[in-house]
A protein has these predicted regions:
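A domain-level signal for the structural core that forms small-molecule/cofactor-binding pockets
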Residues: 2-58
């Protein structure tokens, strides 16, 4: 059973819903499994807790 953990800046629920639907379709197709076997968790991380290129984002 695939488990996808996505950490990202906070996004609206509509965005997470669309991502979950599309990612589930892709995983199901390529792994030849039914949609209910794909798990996705979204973890919102505030910008001030991210660093990219050595610079804090918040």
């Amino acid at each position: 059973m695939p488990f996808i953990h996505i950490r990202m800046f906070p996004r609206p629920q509509e965005v997470k819903k669309a991502l979950a639907e599309e990612l589930t379709k892709i995983i199901s197709k390529h792994c030849k499994i039914t949609d209910d076997h794909t798990w996705i968790v979204f973890e919102d991380v505030q910008k001030e807790h991210w660093s990219m290129g050595g610079k804090l984002q918040g």
